[in-house]
């Protein structure tokens, strides 16, 4: 399949059932704060199922007074599916390696669209900056990470200062972005072409307005001075993902950034996130260097 099909949740659930079954067998030197609201329940758009996050913290006190580095992880699912509870293994693995992990839910399409999803992610980031010290994290060392559609949303957090300013962050706090087979980096070009059968499904989250497609495509927000990016691309992923990621990297290079760009041979799209169950892989190795863990 060549088209851009982004991690339907049913397929992922089948793939991770063994991982979840063994989660409690694996040593987990971490603490988990579950279902923490990141939007006030008095807010008119508060969603008790989607405006929540989990925080995974190392059990040991941070070696630095400021606290552990922080990674905010955003799940994928074609912008229409997905749940933080599938990704407990990522939170556990990061905490085991000296990182405070924040794994979030956000509202899905329909009924909302990508701008509302990006706003939810920005609100989760604002909550993280304000509260992460309570969980042993350093608010001055916050990084974002996402897989599939979550990668595109994470890239928006790293590039769209105006979005963050709307949600209480006048200065962008993101210190780096980890892209795990990201989708949605250039939906403007993708939706203009409509090359593959079924591409109209992406009009559900992105709507019919090309101006909105461009506004929600982080590739058009690249400029000098952005935080560092690192990329991990499956050698057998969808051409749209490898293509847009390569163009994103090239635009970053034109600004003077030299983003590490790792192609993992033989990896399809879903295994690019499933491999994070195992602690010893190249994604964690490079991530830990980036965040200074």
Regions found by a protein language model. Give the residues of each.
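Primarily recognizes the serine-hydrolase "nucleophile elbow" in alpha/beta-hydrolase
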Residues: 126-192
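Mobile cap/lid helix-loop segments that gate and shape the active-site cleft of serine hydrolases
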Residues: 41, 188-221
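C-terminal catalytic histidine-bearing segment of alpha/beta-hydrolase fold enzymes
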Residues: 232, 246-249, 253-293
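Short beta-strand/loop motif that positions the catalytic acidic residue
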Residues: 225, 230-233
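Short beta-strand element of the alpha/beta-hydrolase
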Residues: 65-76
